[in-house]
């Protein structure tokens, strides 16, 4: 999985969390077709389906569950890094 983007990870975790492409799109301020395209690209990169569509319901596949563990770690670490850097920007700097 050499060409996976952070955007794809965020989209993937949102779809898995909400069980809906439409709701994930709304949450991420993207169009539903943009979400579908990101998932399609991610599935192509993985070489496996990540979601199973049963009627109007979306379920995460076994491969999707495995990827979700890693994608959640990646997105959590990125959020934490952003929070740490934001806190550092708030520190006064100087020589004592």
Could you say what each language-model-derived stretch is?
Residues 1-11, 17:
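Extreme N-terminal segment that seeds HTH/winged-HTH DNA-binding domains in transcriptional regulators
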Residues 5-8, 32, 64, 71, ...:
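The N-cap/first-turn positions of alpha helices
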Residues 13-30:
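Short helix-boundary/capping micro-motifs
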Residues 27-28, 39, 46, 67:
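Core residues of bacterial helix-turn-helix
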Residues 43-60:
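A short LG(V/I)-centered, amphipathic sequence patch enriched
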Residues 45-46, 50, 67-89:
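Alpha-helical linker/hinge and terminal dimerization helices associated
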Residues 56, 86-96:
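Interdomain hinge and pocket-entrance segments immediately C-terminal to HTH DNA-binding domains
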């Amino acid at each position: 999985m050499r060409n996976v983007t952070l955007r794809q990870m965020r989209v993937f975790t949102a779809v898995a969390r909400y069980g809906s492409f439409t709701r994930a799109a709304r949450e991420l301020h993207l169009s539903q077709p943009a979400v579908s395209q990101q998932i399609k690209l991610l599935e192509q990169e993985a070489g496996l389906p990540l979601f199973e569509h049963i009627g109007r319901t979306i379920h995460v596949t076994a491969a999707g569950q495995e990827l979700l563990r890693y994608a959640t770690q990646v997105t959590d670490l990125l959020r934490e890094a952003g929070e740490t850097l934001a806190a550092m920007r708030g520190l006064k700097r100087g020589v004592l």
